[in-house]
């Protein structure tokens, strides 16, 4: 019974950590990252479709992303979707592909991204604390139902806290790593 609670807590905590890392991919660092376009969708025959499912998206160099649609009529649609996404660059349509030229980041932009990374980390920590609360509630219910003794419950609470501390530390390390990556010129 307790192992199920611990395993569930571990699984959910891992998911929170993975979600944080996925969120980090949306932050721009010194070099371009094609994942900055992951949230952009285009109208493809009446259906909103992710950009990477209708075009080839490549980072041609450290400051340029090239988007080549599989169907030429999509060029205008892709161009307007990127403009509407407000990612800080203007799309450049050359008739074959859409190119995005990212200017070097200013110190202020880097610091703003660090703030966003810290906020994402804080959100992940809140998620971990909510997972801890759910695990503690499950232990409390077992104790109340007399399925486990008071001593077993105390050990279980300690184990839940230990798992929480482990994942909180992992989140802090991820944020610190991302922060140094963002500030690197």
From Swiss-Prot:
MF terms (GO), sorted A to Z: ribosomal large subunit binding
Keyword Cell membrane: no
Main location: cytoplasm
This protein's UniProt keywords: Cytoplasm, Protein biosynthesis
Compartment(s) of residence: Cytoplasm
GO cellular component, one term: cytosol
Function: Responsible for the release of ribosomes from messenger RNA at the termination of protein biosynthesis. May increase the efficiency of translation by recycling ribosomes from one round of translation to another.
NCBIfam families for this protein: frr
Protein name per Swiss-Prot or TrEMBL: Ribosome-recycling factor
Lineage: Bacteria, Pseudomonadati, Campylobacterota, Epsilonproteobacteria, Campylobacterales
Gene name in the database record: frr
